[in-house]
Structure formats: C-alpha cells, structure tokens
Amino acid sequence: MKAQLLTIGDELLIGQTTNTNAAWLGGRLSRLGVRMTRTVTVGDAREAIFRELDRAYEEARLVICTGGLGPTHDDLTRTVIADYFGAPLQTDPDVLERVRQYYDRRNRDVPPSAPALAQRPEGFETLDNPVGAAVGLWHEAPDGRLIVLLPGIPEEMTAIFEASVQPRLEEQSGVGEVRHRTLVTAGIGETALQEKLGDLSDVLGDDVSLAYLPSTSGVRLRLSADARQTTAGARLDTVEAAIRERAGDDIIGTGDVTLEAVLGDALRARDATIASAESATGGLIGHRLTGVSGSSDYYLGSVVAYANSAKKTVLGVDEAAIREHGAVSEAVAVQMAEGVREALGTTVGVSTTGIAGPTGGTPDKPVGTVWVGYADASERHARRHQFVEDRTLNKELFASAALEEARRTLSV
C-alpha cells in the first residue's frame, strides 16, 4: 500500500513548531509495511490544502492529513475535505455530547466555537480522541482508497492512530508489502560504519535494501525486503548475520532499542549501579537513564558540577589537576567519575567535561571537545572525543559517548 502524508499548519512552515507528526507517522507506517511515497507540509490556506489533497488522493491509496481540525477560523481541514468530496458537513450528536463532557470534566465553559469539533463530512466515520476534544475522521472510498484526518497536537494524533487507525490499517489488503528489520549500533559514525561493513552488494542482492539512519546515539541499519516473497525472512536473516559478523559489538540490538536501555540491561545483569558526574551535559545523562522504566534498579543519581568550584567541593577534583590540565582534561574527567562513584556509593561512575560551544574553544581544545570518564572498582580511564560546533547537538553527543563508554567497558 502506498501512502502520502499531508501536514497542515502555518506554525509548521515558519518553524514555530517542529513537525514531529511526520517523523512519527513515517516510522509507524514503515513498521506496518506501508510505503510512504511523499510528505508535504502546507499552511492554513484553503487553495493549498485542496491542491495537495487532490494530488495525494490521486497518487496514493492511503492519505493521512494532520492538523486543521480545531474549532477556530484557521482550522480549515474539515471544510476543504467536505468541498473536495462534495459532502456536506453534518453535526454528530454523539461527538457533540463528548465535546461538552470534555469541557465539563475540566470545569471549563464550552466555548461558542466548540460545536465545530462535532462536524464531519457526510460519509466519514469519527475516530474517538481519548486525550482531547478534536476527533479524527476516517473515509474508505468504493475503490478502496483511504483518507484519515487526525488532529495536529502530537499526543492526540498518536493516541487516535494507535487506538483506531492502526487496527483498521492492519485489516487492509496491501499492508505489510514491505518487511523491515532494524539493527541498532552505538559508538561508531556513519562513515566509519560503512567502511567497516565494506561492500555488501553480494550479500544484499537485488531483493534486500540497506539504509543508514544516523542519530546522536548511533546509526540504525534498516534492512527492507518484499514481504510478498516467501524467502523474505530468510534473506533478512542472511544479511543480518553478515552485518553482525562485520560490525561486532558495535551492534547493540534491534528494533526500537535505545543505548540507555541496553546499558541498563548490562548493569542489571551484573547487579551493578551507576551514577554520573556531569559538567557539559548538564544532567542529560541522568535524564536519558531515567527515561527507561525500571531504571531505579541501577541508577542512583547525578551530580551536575558545572563550575570548577563544584567539581572540587562536591566531587573532590584536585585543584592542581584543574590548574595544570584545565577542567576539560583526562585527569579531571577521571577524578569526576571516581568522585561521583564514591559520593553516591555506586559500582560505576561516568563523567563528562567538555566545550559544548559556541564559545569557549581554543586551538588545543576546540568547540566540540569532550573528555568522558569512567570508574569502577578496578578500572579508571577517560577518552577524548571531538564532535561538532552546535551546542545542543554536542550535549546529546557527549551524553551518548558517556553511556556508550559505560556499555563497552562493562561488556569487556
């Protein structure tokens, strides 16, 4: 099944809001075996929405639109859809009652514009919104083409998709034509990974494709095969085995696994605990570790020691080490890791001290420099990394480097 996505809203075009809906839907549809062929973003303009809707509906069997389902004057999706299909808008009394109950539960007056939320084009089915007021809409044409309308608020969009859209799609013919398998790596960049894997053309053949999907925590390798072929599963197994043989312990798992979850499993398997001493990452390591359910089994806490005075008084870093080597140095990173390990009584301590930028760099320590420290009962070391010039991106990369340092050291 081919699909196209139309995301609607001026806020998306001007960069006021990040279009997370497109990324989320693309990933979810891909896992369902739906082939996304095009994604378009348009503003709150009737003609633009109509034009892009017409193109998508002509080219794809499934069209998903997000945004423009609210009750305000710039929420145009319902009326454009009604015009496109020549279907008059109707008020659904059941939806209208649910809208009233939604506001009553929150002790809020029902706004005069709220009844617009209960309108739907004739022939469309409503999809209940378990977390908001704006319902989704579903339409299946006699020729099997599908159009789905979802709210633009990400939490509402995902809730409706998971509860109502995905189950319906799974019943459709043509879904699952593409079979994917994702291998997750850590601690190696895209270029280095490509060089390590070498030429895979003989292994891939003509029936399996490989895509490199880099992120701040590693590179995902997505294998794709035609699910209609009876050999698809076996071929994916063969290619995966070849990649694992070449990549070794750079591969940390499959599917949606995360670096922090894999590290957590390694700690739990060893009945070990961890704490982080963070300077440049400002608590991001702790944030990522606590994003894993059950992380209280092994994560005890963090010390954000941004100033040199905090490094000395809280973590016990030597004044002489800072004076001789600087705060961004191997010696300080090691002492920070050991200091937080002793302070919190953990098995493992990790640390980051670096220059996230955009200022603060020197010829010897340019922006993007970070030292990652590691300490346990028998091992104390630090490793230097050089990343980019963007502050936000560097913080993510620094945190990933620390998590990966702990994972690799524990796996030895």
Swiss-Prot record:
SMART domains: MoCF_biosynth
InterPro entries according to UniProt: CinA, CinA-like_C, CinA_C, CinA_KH, Competence-induced_CinA, MoaB/Mog-like_dom_sf, MoaB/Mog_dom
One Pfam assignment: CinA_KH
Family of the protein in this entry: Belongs to the CinA family.
Name under which the protein is recorded: CinA-like protein
Organism in which the protein naturally occurs: Salinibacter ruber (strain DSM 13855 / M31)
